């Protein structure tokens, strides 16, 4: 290295001295002639002498500095390369250790038994760190909401976690398509804690709802919710979850009798709700005027309803509330034949028997008419009511009014929720499997059982606002069946989103 430096200095010394160069500068006229511009003018020639200064001490020092800079740069690059290789080796070793430690831990995750997070630590820094970690898990999961190495994740088993950073998913006051019957904060409910609970499955994560991806999934397609007012509750939730992401003037709500349509023109997508509380044709088919206590279904008539939803790309049925007894000894009528043909016959049956008749007719129709290569079918589980506060140690006169916390009893089940009806639905829909038609059950019942705090009660408007006398009588007028929005139905739709996008 040093011999190269001295050789360089000797070469510099040889070039030292004074050099004289003579530059001949032609006048503009001469330059014009050279370019072919012939003018009768004399050519003027100017001479200029340029002197180059000798390369002295300053030049030598400059060369030395430049040389040392080059040598230092090469050495630094070599050192950094060695450091990078060492860091890579350490990182690979740590990654292997983490993988070995995580293998037994993945099995332990599913063994969690707690339903709720301790209230005293919900707002603590530790809770925030845990939530951030969970978000990272969701963002990097394998797509089905499960942990690595787990083939199936049961989203319906888990706990409610208070989360004031990512909940609610939207503002009920800003959703322009919300219905007054579930707009609780609009009608005077001041506590908003019910909006900030997030459902956390045991041992896995529920995929986060992405409205833009969901709308893209619905591009040129139609999603239909078919059922009663609880299903309409879920439909309103879905509309509120996506409408904020659609520009004004590019969305619309259309009423057409029993059909309500939300249209997203940007995507040529439609999200419908169709009123059909008993699934078959019945005396309750009018979405506004219908008799609740005296119910009649036509056992062999479904075509009028089916013509509305059979060509949809995605269908979400529900049917539970209207099959429940409103009083002891309540029954219903099943009609066979028609009065027009003169063969009408009415049978009186138990409510649950009518439910089975309706599901079998629906299944028969789906098996014969649905396009299994196009349409995906879902059936929402039973939505529990919280009308009897004594079930959790409260006052029945208030029903679920003034409740601000979920029920913190693991695996809590209300005595009024009929789980056998869902078992019957699974059994009946299972007969479609040999035909290649799968009805996916949205198992929403258990997670909803905990949420006694999430109903509209008196904070709602049903056609007309409640009077002062009605507000003062919650035992009759508090709605503990439907759900405030934002709220529990948002999680139902997260289930639907997860199935549509990841399974």
Curated annotation (Swiss-Prot):
Q: Which GO terms describe its molecular function?
A: O-acetyltransferase activity; xylan O-acetyltransferase activity
Q: Where is this motif: GDS motif?
A: 227-229
Subcellular location field: Golgi apparatus membrane
Q: In UniProt terms, what function does this protein have?
A: Xylan acetyltransferase required for 2-O- and 3-O-monoacetylation of xylosyl residues in xylan. Catalyzes the 2-O-acetylation of xylan, followed by nonenzymatic acetyl migration to the O-3 position, resulting in products that are monoacetylated at both O-2 and O-3 positions.
Q: Which UniProt keywords are given for this protein, alphabetically ordered?
A: Disulfide bond, Glycoprotein, Golgi apparatus, Membrane, Plant defense, Signal-anchor, Transferase, Transmembrane, Transmembrane helix
- Origin, by domain of life? Eukaryota
Transmembrane segment boundaries: 55-77
The top EC class is: transferase
Q: Which E.C. number(s) belong to this protein?
A: 2.3.1.-
> What membrane topology was assigned to this protein in its record?
Single-pass type II membrane protein
Protein name from the UniProt record = Xylan O-acetyltransferase 12
The entry sums up its family as follows: Belongs to the PC-esterase family. TBL subfamily.
Q: Which residues lie on this side of the membrane: Cytoplasmic?
A: 1-54
Membrane topology (Lumenal): 78-503
Q: Which residues are glycosylated?
A: 154, 164, 190, 210, 256, 268, 373, 402, 443
Give disulfide pairs as residue numbers. Answer: 153-204, 175-240, 184-484, 400-480
Which GO cellular component does the record give, naming just one? Answer: Golgi apparatus
Effect of a null allele: Stunted growth and reduced plant height. The double mutants tbl1 and tbl2 exhibit increased susceptibility to the bacterial pathogen Xanthomonas oryzae pv oryzae (Xoo).
Give the active-site positions: 229 (nucleophile), 479 (proton donor), 482 (proton acceptor)
């Amino acid at each position: 290295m040093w011999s190269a430096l001295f050789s360089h200095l000797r070469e510099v010394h040889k070039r030292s001295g004074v050099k004289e160069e003579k530059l001949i500068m032609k006048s503009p006229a001469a330059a014009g002639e050279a370019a072919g511009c012939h003018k009768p003018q004399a050519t003027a020639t100017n001479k200029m002498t340029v002197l180059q200064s000798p390369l002295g001490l300053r030049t030598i020092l400059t060369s030395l500095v430049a040389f040392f800079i080059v040598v230092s740069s090469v050495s630094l690059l070599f050192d950094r390369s060695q450091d990078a290789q060492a860091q890579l080796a350490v990182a690979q070793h740590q990654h292997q250790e983490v993988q070995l430690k995580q293998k037994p831990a993945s099995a332990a995750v599913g063994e969690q038994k707690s339903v709720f997070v301790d209230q005293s630590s919900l707002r603590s820094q530790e809770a925030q760190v845990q939530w951030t970690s969970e978000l990272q898990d969701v963002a990097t999961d394998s797509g089905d909401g499960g942990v690595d190495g787990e083939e199936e994740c049961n989203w319906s088993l888990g706990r409610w976690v208070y989360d004031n950073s990512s909940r609610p998913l939207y503002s009920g006051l800003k959703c322009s398509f919300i219905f007054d019957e579930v707009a609780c904060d609009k009608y005077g409910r001041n506590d908003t804690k019910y909006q900030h609970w997030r459902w956390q499955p045991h041992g896995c994560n529920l995929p986060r709802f992405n409205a833009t991806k969901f709308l893209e999934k619905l591009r040129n397609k139609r999603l239909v919710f078919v059922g009663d007012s609880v299903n309409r509750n879920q439909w309103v939730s879905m509309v509120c979850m996506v409408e904020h992401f659609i520009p004004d003037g590019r969305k619309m709500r259309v009423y057409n009798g029993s059909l309500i349509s939300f249209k997203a023109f940007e995507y040529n997508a439609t999200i419908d709700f169709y009123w059909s509380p008993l699934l078959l044709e019945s005396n309750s088919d009018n979405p506004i005027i219908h008799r609740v206590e005296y119910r009649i279904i036509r056992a062999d008539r479904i075509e009028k309803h089916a013509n509305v939803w059979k060509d949809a790309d995605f269908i979400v049925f529900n049917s539970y509330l209207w099959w429940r007894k409103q009083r002891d000894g309540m029954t219903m009528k099943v009609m066979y034949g028609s009065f027009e043909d003169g063969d009408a016959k009415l049978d009186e049956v138990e409510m649950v028997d009518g439910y089975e008749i309706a599901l079998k007719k629906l299944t028969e129709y789906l098996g014969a008419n649905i396009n299994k290569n196009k349409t995906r079918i879902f059936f929402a589980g039973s939505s529990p009511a919280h009308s009897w506060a004594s079930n959790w140690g409260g006052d029945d006169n208030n029903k679920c009014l003034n409740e601000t916390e979920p029920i913190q009893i693991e695996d809590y089940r209300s005595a009024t929720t009929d789980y056998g009806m869902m078992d019957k639905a699974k059994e009946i829909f299972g007969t479609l499997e040999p035909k290649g038609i799968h009805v996916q059950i949205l198992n929403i019942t258990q997670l909803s059982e905990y949420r006694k705090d999430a109903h509209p009660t008196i904070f709602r408007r049903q056609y007309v606002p409640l009077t002062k006398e009605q507000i003062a009588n919650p035992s009759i007028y508090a709605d503990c069946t439907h759900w405030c929005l934002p709220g529990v139905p948002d999680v139902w739709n997260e289930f639907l989103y997860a199935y549509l996008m990841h399974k």
